[in-house]
Amino acid sequence: MIALLQRVSEAAVRVDGETVGAIGPGILALIGVQRGDTEAQAARLLERILGYRLFEDEAGRMNLSLSDTGGGLLLVPQFTLAADTRKGMRASFTPAAEPGLGRALFDHLVSLACSVHTPVATGCFGAHMAVSLVNDGPVTFWLEVPPPR
């Protein structure tokens, strides 16, 4: 399971012109689900998202996590993160989870997040979304919890 984390001043996602999720300062996390991922990967990825230190402390060092700051978390499904781009000029989506598994694990991740953090907002799985953000820094990190072998 993959998360592309972006520290934001604000972020929002719209579907058909309607805002379905928005946060102030916090993390926009684009989420990709890979074949073979399980609920264990989702739980570990959430632990890393909430605990990853990408906010500055009083000394200006990135020593604070989202759990420390209480900022917003916007989770947006993005299956293209699981693409294989090593060859040619077109991505292969073979590594991406089938839509049913992808939706189930994204929903599980959201449920876990809502049970331990607030505020949490989300995009819509399978929808064409317009995502807007103000990247703070910019600070962007790629986190991955590989599927079991």
Swiss-Prot record:
Q: Which GO molecular function terms does the record list?
A: D-tyrosyl-tRNA(Tyr) deacylase activity; Gly-tRNA(Ala) deacylase activity; Ser(Gly)-tRNA(Ala) hydrolase activity; tRNA binding
Q: Which reaction does it catalyse?
A: glycyl-tRNA(Ala) + H2O = tRNA(Ala) + glycine + H(+); a D-aminoacyl-tRNA + H2O = a tRNA + a D-alpha-amino acid + H(+)
Q: How does it assemble?
A: Homodimer.
List where in the cell it is found: Cytoplasm
Q: Which UniProt keywords apply?
A: Cytoplasm, Hydrolase, RNA-binding, tRNA-binding
Q: Where is this motif: Gly-cisPro motif, important for rejection of L-amino acids?
A: 137-138
Q: What is this protein called?
A: D-aminoacyl-tRNA deacylase
